[in-house]
């Protein structure tokens, strides 16, 4: 779920507040459209598509589905918990790791969505 995703982000990117990822580029935090503005925004686009796939599992609601995972020194490991939970956890784990690898560009935070995300 989104609360657990926030915690995963904090694990992989501990020096940046999670809310900096909630309104970034064209895909982080609000659905999304257009071309991602950079690699970090592309991480969010991939995460959105991953959630779309998880929603195809009967009864799976990624934004609220809880799952079990472990975090140890920046390493995230999803635990068994059924097909939906495993799928959602993996979406969040992959995205949090992607965030850690991508460069955060302050100019892409809180951009003019209508002008830049066509």
UniProtKB/Swiss-Prot annotation:
A Gene Ontology biological process term: arachidonate secretion
Entry comment describing in which tissues the protein is expressed: Expressed by the venom gland.
UniProt main location, coarse: secreted
Record text on cofactor binding: Binds 1 Ca(2+) ion.
Disulfide bond positions: 11-72, 26-117, 28-44, 43-98, 50-91, 60-84, 78-89
Active site: 47, 92
Enzyme class: hydrolase
One Gene Ontology MF term: calcium ion binding
Gene Ontology, cellular component aspect: extracellular region
Requisite cofactors: Ca(2+)
EC number(s) from the headed UniProt entry: 3.1.1.4
Compartments where found: Secreted
PROSITE patterns with a match to the protein in the record: PA2_ASP, PA2_HIS
Catalytic reactions of this protein: a 1,2-diacyl-sn-glycero-3-phosphocholine + H2O = a 1-acyl-sn-glycero-3-phosphocholine + a fatty acid + H(+)
Keywords in alphabetical order: Calcium, Disulfide bond, Hydrolase, Lipid degradation, Lipid metabolism, Metal-binding, Secreted
Binding-site residues, Ca(2+): 27, 29, 31, 48
Record-linked InterPro entries: PLipase_A2 (IPR001211), PLipase_A2_Asp_AS (IPR033112), PLipase_A2_dom (IPR016090), PLipase_A2_dom_sf (IPR036444), PLipase_A2_His_AS (IPR033113)
PANTHER family the UniProt entry points to: PHOSPHOLIPASE A2 (PTHR11716:SF100), PHOSPHOLIPASE A2 FAMILY MEMBER (PTHR11716)
Family the UniProt entry places it in: Belongs to the phospholipase A2 family. Group I subfamily. D49 sub-subfamily.
Role according to the record: PLA2 catalyzes the calcium-dependent hydrolysis of the 2-acyl groups in 3-sn-phosphoglycerides.
Protein name: Basic phospholipase A2 1
Native source organism of the sequence: Naja melanoleuca
Record lineage: Eukaryota, Metazoa, Chordata, Craniata, Vertebrata
